[in-house]
């Protein structure tokens, strides 16, 4: 089971990027890395001095997804790669199907959906580094180590 992982600063950067580069109706998606839930649990355990043996694997809850999808196949087909982001412009096509049958649509990308299972997967050290970039986590580590 995988999930995207993004800090608050990265989320703010996405919003600022959208303001600068997006237009009405666009979808903007950051090419965020992901990690498995197990990797996240082990990274937190290591950071907080916990015992990994205490991690319980309870399986998938009813209705829970194995991975998150940020862009579907159709959205990826129209996506514009902007480096660290994808931009999916709003659909401005008209209903003139005759034009489609004459001209076709050869500009469509052939990307598959962008999901947490086919993006960069972080290992335990990378997840720990991302978590340590968060002030809340650093404060929590200090408060726990002072109690011991």
What are the residue ranges of the model-derived segments?
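Strand-loop microenvironment adjacent to phosphate/nucleotide-handling motifs in alpha/beta enzyme folds
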Residues: 1-148
């Amino acid at each position: 089971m995988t999930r995207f992982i993004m800090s608050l600063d990265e989320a703010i950067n996405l919003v600022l990027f959208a303001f600068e580069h997006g237009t009405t109706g666009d979808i903007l998606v950051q090419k965020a890395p992901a990690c498995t839930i197990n990797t996240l649990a082990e990274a937190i355990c290591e950071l907080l001095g916990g015992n990994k043996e205490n991690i319980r694997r309870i399986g998938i809850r009813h209705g829970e997804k194995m991975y998150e999808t940020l862009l579907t196949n159709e959205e990826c087909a129209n996506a514009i790669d902007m480096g660290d982001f994808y931009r999916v412009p709003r659909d401005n096509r008209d209903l003139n199907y005759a034009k489609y049958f004459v001209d076709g649509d050869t500009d469509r990308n052939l990307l598959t959906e962008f999901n947490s299972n086919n993006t960069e997967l972080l290992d335990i050290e990378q997840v720990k580094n991302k978590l340590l970039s968060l002030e809340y986590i650093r404060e929590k580590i200090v408060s726990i180590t002072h109690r011991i």
